[in-house]
Amino acid sequence: MIKDCLSDSVTLYQGDALNILATLPDAVMAAVLTDPPYSSGGVTMGARQTDPAQKYQQSGTKRQYPPMLGDAKDQRSWTMWCTLWLGECWRVARDGAPLMVFTDWRQLPALSDAVQAAGWSWRGIIAWDKRSSRPQIGKFRQQCEYVLFATKGRFVARTRTCLPGLYSYPVIAVHKVHLTSKPVALIEDLLAITAPQASVLDPFMGGGSVGEACIRTGRKYVGMELSQEYYDISRNRLTALLEAEK
């Protein structure tokens, strides 16, 4: 495990999220917002074990990204694995803390089971309209992904604003540093449910979009990443942003 404190408000870990989460004390995080590997992209084991670039990129895309780790689990093992790390997140979260986890339509039912099995109180689903997706002749486009929203116990409002349940942002290829990068503006919108300067836990840092959104909105950030390649990408990205904001 590697630990880097980039600033008083940004701490990064390189290693397995379950192992790292076990080292954190109870009830220290104000929120959890993360984008774990979906282990999706097919209904058979063979399809799930396909190269993530083939599962999640539209045909004709030329840009190559570092490989994703942990994206080939079958649904039952994925659900059990999610229950484990979600349980650790519940332990380190404060009472009333919000949980927001990205998923797709295939894994939404399994994720909702894991969230509740881990002790969280399920509060709803937020839709992210990507505005486009791979076309399927004779079928509806799968152009939405979802954010499962839950809390640790009783919901505690941190804002007087009424937040929408649908956000529409395109995926802009030139802004992506990860195969499944989420728009930073979308993350910033989701963070509106947290208090200013809240500490946000992200066990699956990927390309660092949640970290960037936290820095830009004045939140504290704790990010974890298994892949050394993506850890280096995120560390460099967030270091540059912190330097630019001095």
Where are these regions (language model features)?
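Core catalytic lobe of class I
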Residues: 1-232
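Short, conserved SAM-binding/catalytic segment
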Residues: 1-7, 235-246
